[in-house]
Regions:
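Conserved short acidic donor-positioning loop in nucleotide-sugar-dependent glycosyltransferases
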Residues: 266
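Structural cue for short, hydrophobic secondary-structure segments
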Residues: 31-34, 57
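Active-site machinery of serine-nucleophile hydrolases
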Residues: 50-59
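Flexible "cap/lid" subdomain of the alpha/beta-hydrolase fold that forms the substrate-access gate
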Residues: 2-9, 16-18, 25-28, 40-42, ...
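Conserved alpha/beta-hydrolase "nucleophile elbow" surrounding the catalytic nucleophile
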Residues: 33-35, 102-103
């Protein structure tokens, strides 16, 4: 049986000190957050999954309670930098292979890892993933009205404005957590407070925004062979405003070993919006 609660740890990979939580025993299963996220976004999933797996949930570089490298985004916050952190992390634990569940920006980093180190990835689960088949649809009308934040995050003063007070940080984070959920009233005050505290850590807003800056500066793989042959299940919420379900149309081109499931009535944060359904899907797919 899983222990009562996850334990907190730190390790250093590629010169970056990463915070992570761990719970359970068995085959390793990593849960990797996106933006605006950190380890806590999986708090409804860690315990149930830990009854079946050794669950490991990091704060990635630049986020929450991990180090925030003071490097240009196109150097320190590329998909390759994050992929190398994942590789170094599993090397630290001497894992031959891992299973990974991820979404949002985490899906970008993990796709890069899957292409660089396919032999290290046993199975993959993605929620509403950004992927190459979306192309320029982010900035077509009317979707561009949902994607404005990606341009805002390019501004050098963005973190100063959002971080000018905890109240400002709360307003900004609460907007995305609510607007991207099928039920905008889902989030409790305690949950919002946890996010605000994480993003009030020195450099945390900048670290998250740097991921978007890196993407706009050529820091994400967009050419060459973008195929991922790892057995992959994609769960896509049909109420996700920022990544509409229609964008799943080209997944088979890039994931030839694909299982796609439409999650009805679920928005962008399905791990929080429908944890029981999500946990059951993960366990069913990941168990050999």
């Amino acid at each position: 049986m899983a222990t009562a609660s996850p334990s907190h740890h730190y390790t250093t990979v590629n010169g970056v000190k990463l915070h992570y939580v761990r719970q359970g025993a068995g085959e390793p299963l990593m849960l990797i957050h996106g933006w605006p996220g950190f380890w806590f976004e999986w708090h409804k999933n860690i315990g149930p999954l830990a009854e079946h797996f050794d669950v490991i949930v990091p704060d990635m570089r630049g986020f929450a309670y991990s180090d925030k490298p003071d490097l240009p985004p196109e150097v320190g916050y590329t998909d390759t930098a994050f992929a190398e952190d994942i590789r170094a992390f599993i090397d630290f634990y001497h894992f031959d292979k891992v299973r990974i569940v991820t979404h949002d920006f985490g899906a970008v980093w993990v796709q890069r890892f899957a292409r660089m180190y396919p032999e290290r990835l046993h199975k993959l689960v993605l929620f509403d993933p950004p992927y190459a088949g979306i192309g320029g649809r982010w900035f077509e009308l009317p979707q561009v009205f949902h994607s404005w934040y990606q341009i805002f995050h390019q501004q050098p003063w963005a973190e100063d404005l959002v971080g000018s007070s905890k109240e400002a940080t709360e307003i900004y984070l609460r907007h995305f957590l609510s607007a991207w959920s099928a039920n905008p009233d889902l989030w409790t005050d305690d949950e919002i407070a946890a996010y605000v505290e994480a993003y009030s850590q020195p450099g945390a807003l900048r670290g998250g925004f740097n991921c978007y800056r890196a993407a706009f500066r050529g820091g994400m793989q967009s050419s060459g062979d973008l195929t991922i042959n790892t057995p992959t299940m994609v769960l896509w919420g049909d109420s996700d405003a920022i990544l509409p379900y229609a964008w799943s149309d080209r997944l088979p081109e890039f994931f030839p070993n694909l299982t796609l499931k439409r999650m009805e009535g679920v928005g962008h944060f399905m791990m929080r919006e429908a944890p029981e359904r999500v946990n059951a899907e993960i366990i069913g797919f990941m168990k050999d």
